[in-house]
Amino acid sequence: MAASSACLVGNGLSVNTTTKQRLSKHFSGRQTSFSSVIRTSKVNVVKASLDGKKKQEGRRDFLKILLGNAGVGLVASGKANADEQGVSSSRMSYSRFLEYLDKDRVNKVDLYENGTIAIVEAVSPELGNRVERVRVQLPGLSQELLQKLRAKNIDFAAHNAQEDQGSVLFNLIGNLAFPALLIGGLFLLSRRSGGGMGGPGGPGNPLQFGQSKAKFQMEPNTGVTFDDVAGVDEAKQDFMEVVEFLKKPERFTAVGAKIPKGVLLIGPPGTGKTLLAKAIAGEAGVPFFSISGSEFVEMFVGVGASRVRDLFKKAKENAPCIVFVDEIDAVGRQRGTGIGGGNDEREQTLNQLLTEMDGFEGNTGVIVVAATNRADILDSALLRPGRFDRQVSVDVPDVKGRTDILKVHAGNKKFDNDVSLEIIAMRTPGFSGADLANLLNEAAILAGRRARTSISSKEIDDSIDRIVAGMEGTVMTDGKSKSLVAYHEVGHAVCGTLTPGHDAVQKVTLIPRGQARGLTWFIPSDDPTLISKQQLFARIVGGLGGRAAEEIIFGDSEVTTGAVGDLQQITGLARQMVTTFGMSDIGPWSLMDSSAQSDVIMRMMARNSMSEKLAEDIDSAVKKLSDSAYEIALSHIKNNREAMDKLVEVLLEKETIGGDEFRAILSEFTEIPPENRVPSSTTTTPASAPTPAAV
């Protein structure tokens, strides 16, 4: 026999042995053997202790092997038993039995039920002369049949049914043993795996479906404090009061103040809502529960409401504490939209959440902190005082906030002397805290890839381009396509610069990024939340500049699909001017509910609530805005053909033109509107908000 070796690791020891073992067991007259060869050698200490998780995995592996061996044994036993008994469930007619008897194919006959049933052991030619056991229904035990059996010298015997009850019971137990063992083993596996496939309360343990999945930290060690949170000073101030109340409640109760029951964080993604919650846990030093809103909802009815009850029960037992619910819009969506019916699982869960929050007694010390970026779809009952007493807006930071955030994330990075965090903050309007962290991380990755010891301005520039527009592609070779893209991008820049109120050009490039073969970058205004009608209309003109350049330079038949992204943007902007901002001939009306802006179903319902005449007026107003902007773009291209040709010539040569160089060349041929003139020092490097040409 070939030798094999096995290495056993357990209780911190690595053991090798040299002994042979052989195990054997008889199953119904058949012998099944299991052999293993183990070599013995030296004992070496590998580890002082074994991790609990490895122990548990070892038990599960052992249980799986045990179940597998038991299954093999039972199958082997059943097969051997079946080979002995044959196919006793097969039936044979009485006439065929007599035919077999005449041809000497019957070996044995067992009679049951007073001779009315016979189990016959016969040789079947259809099965290659195999011996099979068949059941024959006899008309009665006749003397002629007995005499025939004696004459053929066939072994036959009569049996009482009571005598066979033991074997029937044994066969029944044998048939049920394997399923019972399998089910029991699976149950033990699910128990030992801590709740089965779904974890505690998951599908593996049905008894824990209604238990909360919230992560509980008695002494939270998130590693985050308010010093790590920058750019959201107003939100920090509100939460500092909450932390003070949890630490020193007597200071507030002495003057009759009550603890706020809930704080709702509202803001776009990446602005630091979850980071603020971690900072609260780190500062307060009280028990901290964290859970996602989606974990309340399951496929089974009532599970979500049960988990809400279980969560708040644990919170009250550990008060004072903080309960953080991330993405609460998953469970707090507005009710009564007609979607899912009155018994929708989300509505039941929301009803239970409202009840639990409103059922708190005064000053219990339990504060619910929730975060969402879809406050417009939350149920109004969830937002009233007494539930979420405070609503804190966490918006994208301003220049000062961006500078503070960059200082936090730049603490562990090395920069060249020419890198200024203040300049980076000025160049990144609209960036959230997560975007700024990603920006510096991308710059550090690029510096490492280029074998640099510190981050330079070049890495910062490339990182901004990469985050906003995507990965850099291969530059196009000279040809008609490259010339067309150059005219397209210069058309954007010229129409934008010559239209009063438009953002300043940052750079024009033919270097492809993402899906765009060329890009025109503009500097957004300092306050992106306040935009005038003139600025919006100028952006529509600038967006149509690429399409206008293609039509004027190459002819109407040569217009390409490169303006598809531009058309989508300017159509959406024009529709917003008409339906949301009231900047059209229809009048200062808000024709679209704010909650319908980000919800497809609500948008459809709002559209259906309009009259046909009003819908036609909206479409006409949108078309009028787009048509008038396109006429202006066409006139800019026609009146500045020489400037266009010169700019395209320089762009094809350099592949990238900076904003200052672009305006210097353009001003040689035409006058730039005073409001669009920009000091040269403000546009030395690219910023955000590109206008792509997806040719």
From Swiss-Prot:
Keywords: ATP-binding, Chloroplast, Developmental protein, Hydrolase, Membrane, Metal-binding, Metalloprotease, Nucleotide-binding, Plastid, Protease, Thylakoid, Transit peptide, Transmembrane, Transmembrane helix, Ubl conjugation, Zinc
PTM per Swiss-Prot/TrEMBL: The FTSH2 precursor is ubiquitinated by CHIP in the cytoplasm.
Pfam families noted in UniProt: AAA, AAA_lid_3, FtsH_ext, Peptidase_M41
Active site residues per record: 489
One cellular component term from this protein's GO annotations in UniProt: chloroplast envelope
Bilayer-crossing regions: 168-188
Annotated residues for binding of Zn(2+): 488, 492, 566
Start and end residues of each stretch annotated as Disordered: 673-695
Lumenal, thylakoid topological domain residue ranges: 83-167
Expression induction or repression: By cold and high light.
Main subcellular location: plastid
Effect of gene knockout: Leaf-variegated. Mutations can be complemented by overexpression of FTSH8. The presence of both FTSH1 or FTSH5 (subunit type A) and FTSH2 or FTSH8 (subunit type B) is essential for an active complex formation.
Cofactor: Zn(2+)
Topology of the protein relative to the lipid bilayer: Single-pass membrane protein
Enzyme Commission no: 3.4.24.-
Binding site for ATP: 267-274
Biased composition, class Low complexity, residue ranges: 679-695
Residue range covered by the transit peptide: 1-47, 48-82
Subunit composition and interactions: Interacts with CHIP and FTSH5. Heterohexamers with FTSH1, FTSH5 and FTSH8. May also form homooligomers.
The protein's role, per its UniProt record: Part of a complex that function as an ATP-dependent zinc metallopeptidase. Involved in the thylakoid formation and in the removal of damaged D1 in the photosystem II, preventing cell death under high-intensity light conditions, but not involved in thermotolerance.
Protein name listed in UniProt: ATP-dependent zinc metalloprotease FTSH 2, chloroplastic
Lineage: Eukaryota, Viridiplantae, Streptophyta, Embryophyta, Tracheophyta
Gene name per UniProt: FTSH2
